[in-house]
């Protein structure tokens, strides 16, 4: 028995001091021991149409300047272990090919190929000689990058699941909104069918301001709604955005957004009142 205990003590001692940390690990624990990589997407819970007793659709805007939303924006320059959500999506479309459902609008009608996406992200301006247009004086390449992203827009369905007795949301689409570095125009680059983007978002980590050990993926941040957003449109018979009927009144637009959120909360609370 003493021999067995001595052997176990020796093995534990070797294991403790056998942990080799190199400068490449850049931390207290070897990167090989840190389980950052994720290989699968957590599937949505099964939802029957009969269990979905009520639903509505919202369009929301996530401003990346807000502190809570910083994990979706930074780092603007990719780091060895993480990159911004914009770079994750861009690489997944252009390089990895894991995101294929890319469209021009939120109705998902006008499909974009990777080549067309690249032409949107990288614009080439040619300066020609006014006297002889055949002579090219200069070629300027303008590329949209992470620092140009000012917000993200998401399209999601809210529904009450009577089987589970809870209000849930499911993201349908997501779109980066940029400010053009040349013209200062603000516009949506493209819309992505969100279920098609989950694989790329679930295999890339974001910064967790609460605990650096427990890293979160971009998919987890979006699914848990670990962000602050403003509703700018609710599904309606006129298909209008809030700014269409609250023109030039930013304060009233914010109040309307708040009213829509409170209406959603009150509906859920009303179901539990007897």
Describe these PLM feature segments.
Residues 3, 126, 175-177:
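Assembly/interface hotspot detector across virion components, adhesins/toxins, and nucleic-acid enzymes
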Residues 148-150, 170, 188:
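Residues that flank catalytic or metal-binding motifs in active/ligand-binding sites
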Residues 10, 17, 165, 185, ...:
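Short conserved micro-motifs at the rims of enzyme active sites and ligand-binding pockets
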Residues 1-26:
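Bacterial Sec-dependent N-terminal signal peptides
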Residues 19-163, 194-274:
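A domain-level signal for the mature, folded cores of soluble proteins
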Residues 166, 171-186:
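Extended serine/threonine-enriched, polar tracts that run as long, contiguous segments within proteins
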Residues 183-196:
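Short linear, low-complexity motifs centered on an aromatic residue
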């Amino acid at each position: 028995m003493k021999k067995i205990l001595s052997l176990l003590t020796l093995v534990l001692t070797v294991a403790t001091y056998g942990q080799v940390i190199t400068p490449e690990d850049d931390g207290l624990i070897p990167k090989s021991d840190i389980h950052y990589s994720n290989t699968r997407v957590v599937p949505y819970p099964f939802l029957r149409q009969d269990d979905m007793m009520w639903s509505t659709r919202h369009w929301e805007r996530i401003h990346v300047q807000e502190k809570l939303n910083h994990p979706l924006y930074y780092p603007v320059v990719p780091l060895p272990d993480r990159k911004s959500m914009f770079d994750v999506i861009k690489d997944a479309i252009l390089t990895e090919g894991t995101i294929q459902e890319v469209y021009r609008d939120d109705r998902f009608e006008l499909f974009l190929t990777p080549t067309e996406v690249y032409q949107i992200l990288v614009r080439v301006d040619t300066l020609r000689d006014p006297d002889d247009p055949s002579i090219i004086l200069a070629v300027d390449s303008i590329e949209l990058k992470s620092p140009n992203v000012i917000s993200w827009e998401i399209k999601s369905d809210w529904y009450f699941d009577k089987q589970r007795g809870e209000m849930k949301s499911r993201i349908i689409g997501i779109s980066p909104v940029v400010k053009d570095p040349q013209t200062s125009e603000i516009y949506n680059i493209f819309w992505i069918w969100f279920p098609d983007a989950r694989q790329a978002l679930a295999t890339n980590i974001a910064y967790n301001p609460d605990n650096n050990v427990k890293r979160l993926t971009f998919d987890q941040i979006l699914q848990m709604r670990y962000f602050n957003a403003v509703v700018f449109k609710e599904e309606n018979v006129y298909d209008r955005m809030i700014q269409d009927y609250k023109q030039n009144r930013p304060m009233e637009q914010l109040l309307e957004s708040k009213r829509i959120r409170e209406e959603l909360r009150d509906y859920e609370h009303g179901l539990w009142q007897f």
